[in-house]
Structures are given as C-alpha cells and as structure tokens.
Curated annotation (Swiss-Prot):
It is found in: Cytoplasm. InterPro entries: Pantoate_ligase, Pantoate_ligase_C, Rossmann-like_a/b/a_fold. Keywords: ATP-binding, Cytoplasm, Ligase, Nucleotide-binding, Pantothenate biosynthesis. GO terms for cellular component: cytosol. Transmembrane segments: none annotated. It catalyses: (R)-pantoate + beta-alanine + ATP = (R)-pantothenate + AMP + diphosphate + H(+). It comes from Tropheryma whipplei (strain Twist). It holds the Pfam family Pantoate_ligase. Catalyzes the condensation of pantoate with beta-alanine in an ATP-dependent reaction via a pantoyl-adenylate intermediate. Homodimer. This is Pantothenate synthetase.
C-alpha cells in the first residue's frame, strides 16, 4: 500500500474516491502512542486518514508554536503500511480568512484545568477539529484518552452540533517507566524525564498502600511534585462528566488500561512543567 499525501480537501477526496474512512487528527511529530492509535483505528476495517497540522490557535506562546517539532518526512515513513492517506493542509487552507475568525466556545468545562492555564486553548482545539470534520467528512474520528478533557469536549461538540461522525476515545500508551508518550517528551533532558516519570509513577500508585480520600490523594501528588521540584499546574479528581467529586469520598483504586474505551470513570488529572516542558497525565479511579 502506497501512502497518499493530500494538502487540500479536493486532493483528499480524489485520493479516497468516495470511500468511507476514519480520521486520526494529529499535530505530527508522531511517536509510538500515535502509531498505536492508528492501529486502533485500523480495527474498523476502513481506510485510515491521519491529519497532520500544527494548529496556531492552540498555542498561547509563540515560542512554543515556533519550536513545536515538525517532522513530516519522518511521520510519513512511520505511517507507511499503516495509514491510507495523510492530510497535511497549510495554515492558509485551514484559516483562509486569517486566525481572527469565528471560533467555537467550549463552555465552562473548557475553562477549567487546561483551559484555565491556557486561555483559549480549547477554542482552538474545537475550531480546528470542526474544520477538519467538515473538510474531510470521516465516518469515525479517533482521540486518545491521554488528553481526556480534549476528548470530552470534542465528543460533546460533535453531539451538540450534530456532526454526522462517531467519536471514538481509546486508551493510551506509556513507556516502560510509566510516562505517557507525547511529542513534547523529546524536549525532556535526562533529569527532567526522570522527574516526569516519577510523577506518573506516583499517580499510578497513589492508593497502593490503601484507600485514601479524594483530598488526601490530591495532597499526596502535590507533595510529590514539590519534593521533586516540579511546577504543578493542577492535580484534580473529577467524575466522568468532568464535575468535582466530594473531597471526603474514598478512592480505592487507581489504574491505567490501554484497552480502555470511552470516558466512563472518574479521573485523576494532572499537568506540570518539568524544566519548562509541559507534561499531562491521567489515571482512571474507582471512587466510593
């Protein structure tokens, strides 16, 4: 199978020739976690299209945008034999009237956690996902639970705006030291990577020594972040609807499953800066 490359909706339609397909949106700099998501999408027995577009609206820091890795040639090599086509449009194709265009408001849930730290972040996410869905018209679209808040908001947008597409939310991969795969991990030095790994390991083992209250779990991770010198952006436990859980309820289990499908359990979500590099993580919880 020869991987096809399209840079416009017309080129993509020509490649697909009327076939139904599934879409995996990415910003490129593909890693093992992306490839695993593509493999999950292939289980649908439909052609897989991977979009690669570094979306300017998602960045509140111009330096972060400028330094975000762009590795199209390497990405194409990784997708050969796995995807049917890559859709890699230009900024002008996605935003023909410039970046000061109509945006989709994510609502209150888009202004907590990542949305509180990065104002406008989810406006950018939802706007580009909506544009991709309208331009490409997939049968299904795949997202990783690693970015759980993003997946939740996309799923809600699709439902409320009646997009004719099914949103699939899958589990995600971790490396052998428990750190979730991320394109930004390549920016981590040896010391920073070790700290990020310790944070993820702490999240996974938060109730290994017995049940704790929601408040105690958050305090435990906060103390860990402080002890290893990590700048914690947030550490919060929310239910499957991204609502707060009473602080005196008990957490009896924290777990990670690559095979987990959907967003149907409470989550312990955190974000931190480790030597200036953003890391995000979450684990599923059993809360009683």
């Amino acid at each position: 199978m020869n991987l096809k490359l399209a840079s416009s909706p017309h080129e993509l339609r020509t490649c697909l020739a009327g076939r139904a397909f599934v879409l995996v949106p990415t910003m490129g700099a593909l890693h093992e976690g992306h490839i695993w998501l593509v493999d999950m999408a292939r289980r649908c027995n439909l052609p897989v299209v991977v979009s690669i577009f570094v979306n300017p609206l998602q960045f509140d820091d111009s330096l972060d945008l400028d330094t975000y890795p762009r590795t199209l040639e390497q990405d194409l090599e990784k997708l050969e034999g796995k995807a049917f086509a890559v859709y890699s449009p230009s900024v002008e194709t996605m935003y023909p009237n410039g970046l000061d265009s109509i945006r989709i408001d994510p609502g209150p849930i888009g202004r907590i956690l990542e949305g509180a730290i990065r104002p406008g972040f989810f406006d950018g996410i939802l706007t580009i996902v909506a544009k991709l869905l309208l331009q490409t018209a997939p049968e299904r679209v795949f997202f990783s639970k690693k970015d759980a808040q993003q997946a939740f908001l996309v799923r809600r947008m699709v439902r409320e705006l009646a997009f004719p597409v099914r949103v699939e939310v899958t589990g995600f991969l971790r490396d052998k030291f428990s750190l979730p795969y991320s394109s930004r991990n390549r920016k981590l030095g040896v010391d920073a990577r070790e700290k990020a790994q310790r944070l993820s390991q702490g999240l996974l083992s938060v109730v290994n020594n017995g049940p704790l209250t929601v408040r105690d779990c958050i305090d435990k991770i906060t103390d860990l972040a402080n002890s290893i010198g990590v700048d914690l952006g947030y550490a919060q436990i929310l239910d499957e609807n991204f609502c707060e859980i009473a602080s005196d309820r008990m957490v009896t289990r924290a777990f990670h499953s690559e095979a987990c499908i959907g967003l149907n359990t409470p989550l312990f979500l955190l974000a931190a800066r480790v030597h200036g590099v953003r890391v995000v993580d979450n684990v599923d919880l059993v809360v009683v």
